[in-house]
Swiss-Prot record:
Annotated source species: Oryza sativa subsp. japonica
Protein's recorded name: Auxin-responsive protein IAA14
Superkingdom of origin: Eukaryota
Nucleus is among the record's keywords: yes
Family membership noted in the UniProt record: Belongs to the Aux/IAA family.
Subunit structure: Homodimers and heterodimers.
UniProt lineage: Eukaryota, Viridiplantae, Streptophyta, Embryophyta, Tracheophyta
Amino acid sequence: MAAESIDAELRLGLPGSGGGDGVAAKKRRSASSTVKSEASGTACCGGAGARDVEDGASPASKVQVVGWPPVGSYRRSTFQSSSSSTAAAAKGKGGGETDQGRKNKGGGLYVKVSMDGAPYLRKVDLRMYGGYRELRDALDALFGCFSADASASAAHFAVAYEDKDGDLMLAGDVPWDMFISSCKKLRIMRGSEAR
């Protein structure tokens, strides 16, 4: 009766790793002994002669582990293909930097854009725009706050940005390249708050 209760006992742990059974523990080898035996050429299946791989052959390529969700590999392959096609196009055109080449150079510089009173945020790629005028037109298309129809309310909004230090500054006060390198967040705020 006691022997039957031991067989049906539930344990926490991996199957076959019972504490009372010394036979199963003796059959397993530690990782260090496995590495030592493979290095010396005495593998468990017949020694050095059992190896099918030639000494000069490279080992099998490792499969790259991707986190969950597997969006990272898709984005990485998309970025690599677009950057290689951009580089090939730049070499084909003589290396001169065109407007399209400037827009596609490097990765995207996405920043969050929030507007006072809007219950949603958007992200924009600052490298897509050549200056403040293009950025303002894009923000108008997203939020509709600077449109000509609402010319009276257009003066009530100002574009501010948060820089690397966390300071809130008005967009347009610094040159465009400096703005791109230091901008971390965009905020469309009411003109009364901007002053």
